[in-house]
């Protein structure tokens, strides 16, 4: 029998998902049909301490408690009840970074987040040693950089984990990590669903002269796949989440995951030959692979889905910020004329006029580099619009070139996958601000990567919903289905989203544009040098 939201919470059948994002901690309660029934949130910001980006341990727990208290208040206001117990809990967070602890469970240095780029020497050395692309933000890069810098705390390390792994450990007592989050610490072997034994051995040999009193595998969290038991909420853990003391201990907690993995779950993109693209302030694509790539690429990061399939990730620092700045310029012009401003209407009009422009943007070029862009080799960036006297300069082409630029770098990375590695994809789901104006961002992205793009209504629910779904998979998977089948049949049933396919003309036009774009990169380099 289907329970209403109030009865679901009263009966302890609701599932809680919490995600610690870079600017917001969000909690979502879902019902037995995996639909959100209550939410809570807390806003926070990272701090720059001694040149490194961090969040304090105090900020983590006060933020989690405030987020849960907000959820509690919202449940009380909406349904007139307390949350006493739950069917399951899941915790996810931003991936990577560095949280080393000693035997007394004390953090040895402030949490170093994924944003820190002080790990260049370590990442380069490990990429060469492992013959595998090791990004700056990965935990193993942070660990080896601390070793290269002769930091005294390294010998005391008893446990090294991520933010999600830390919170899970503190509320359950279990030193475990979901495979997707673990793949952002150290490369995963897709056959064993564990850390690469070869790379672990190479690392231990590399640091052997230091004579530390630990081996790498001893200090890493145990790797778990979606659906595996990962512990229960302890009495101490319940107090750490719910300062009011109403939440009971003993609730099953699913393996903690990273935000990339929960994003894949929230967009139903964990099956091989599917993918998702997040396009907002920054952008990234995640394509679930059928097999390993033929070789490592510096611009492609390899992670996994929460059930262990390999994923090729292309991450771009810039997406819609420059485009938004131009739209705001048109807003100012409208205000100057004394015309009432409706931002949704301005976006709709400007985005849709772009679709009437030349498919190659009439020769116009835009570089949306508010910051540097590793994929194209620029450490710093300058937003830039360039045209020659003979180019077709009109509003439609102007807006189209800025829309193209918002996914141009993403195209360069994905062209390697589709053209060089011959990767096949059946469905890609788009989510984020670029897709808010119906149909336009979809059509642009479809042309860029020559693939049908779907947009779902639910994609905006985000990672907190994604980790709640993984909690549901832990306790509601009576049929013992794969994660992909569970999502298809119990969550997204009948919701394939609205799909837009690329046209041959748009694809040819974008390909011509991207050749101009790549040829013009020295102009962007000059702008960085002289402006």
Regions found by a protein language model. Give the residues of each.
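Carbohydrate-associated surface elements
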Residues: 116
């Amino acid at each position: 029998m289907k329970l209403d939201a109030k009865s679901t919470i009263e009966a302890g059948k609701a599932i809680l998902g919490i995600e610690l994002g870079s600017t917001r901690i969000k909690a979502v309660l879902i019902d037995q049909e995996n639909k959100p029934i209550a939410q809570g949130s807390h806003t926070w910001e990272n701090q720059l301490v001694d040149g490194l980006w961090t969040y304090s341990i105090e900020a983590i727990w006060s933020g989690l408690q405030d987020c849960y208290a907000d959820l509690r208040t919202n449940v009380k206001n909406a349904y007139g009840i307390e949350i006493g117990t739950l069917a399951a809990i899941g915790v996810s967070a931003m991936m990577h970074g560095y949280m080393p602890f000693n035997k007394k469970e004390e953090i040895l240095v402030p949490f170093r987040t994924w944003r820190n780029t002080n790990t260049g020497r370590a990442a380069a050395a490990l990429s060469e040693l492992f013959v595998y692309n090791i990004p700056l933000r990965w935990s193993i890069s942070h660990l080896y950089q601390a070793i290269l810098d002769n930091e005294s705390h390294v010998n005391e390390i008893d446990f090294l984990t991520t933010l999600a792994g830390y919170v899970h450990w503190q509320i359950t007592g279990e030193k475990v990590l979901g495979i997707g989050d673990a793949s952002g610490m150290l490369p995963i072997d897709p056959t064993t669903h564990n850390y690469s034994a070869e790379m672990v051995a190479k690392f231990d040999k590399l640091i052997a002269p230091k004579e530390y009193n630990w081996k790498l595998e001893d200090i890493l969290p145990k790797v778990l796949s979606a659906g595996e038991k990962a512990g229960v909420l302890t009495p101490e853990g319940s107090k750490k989440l719910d300062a009011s003391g109403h939440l009971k201990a003993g609730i099953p907690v699913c393996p903690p995951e990273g935000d990339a993995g929960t994003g894949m779950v929230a967009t139903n993109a964990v099956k091989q030959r599917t993918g998702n693209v997040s396009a907002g302030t920054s952008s990234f694509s995640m394509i679930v692979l059928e097999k390993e790539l033929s070789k490592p690429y510096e611009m492609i990061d390899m992670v996994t889905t929460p059930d262990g399939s390999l994923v090729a990730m292309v991450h771009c620092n810039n997406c819609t910020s420059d485009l938004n700045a131009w739209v705001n310029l048109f807003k100012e012009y409208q205000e100057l004329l004394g015309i009432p401003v409706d931002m949704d209407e301005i976006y709709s009009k400007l985005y849709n006029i772009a679709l009437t422009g030349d498919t190659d943007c009439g020769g116009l070029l835009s570089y949306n580099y508010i910051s540097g862009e590793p994929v194209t080799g620029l450490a710093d960036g300058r937003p830039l619009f360039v045209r020659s006297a003979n180019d077709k300069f009109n509003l439609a082409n102007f807006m189209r070139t800025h829309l193209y630029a918002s996914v141009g770098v993403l195209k360069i990375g994905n062209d390697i996958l589709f053209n060089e590695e011959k990767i096949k994809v059946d469905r890609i789901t788009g989510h984020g601000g670029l897709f808010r104006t119906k149909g336009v961002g979809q059509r642009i992205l479809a042309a860029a990567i020559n693939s049908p793009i779907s947009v779902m209504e639910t994609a905006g629910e985000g990672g907190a919903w994604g980790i709640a779904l993984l909690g549901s998979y832990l306790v509601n998977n009576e049929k013992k289905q794969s994660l992909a089948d569970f999502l298809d049949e119990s969550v997204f049933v009948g919701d394939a989203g609205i799909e837009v396919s690329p046209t041959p003309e748009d694809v040819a036009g974008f390909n011509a544009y991207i050749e101009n774009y790549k040829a013009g990169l020295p102009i962007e380099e000059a702008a960085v040098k002289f402006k």
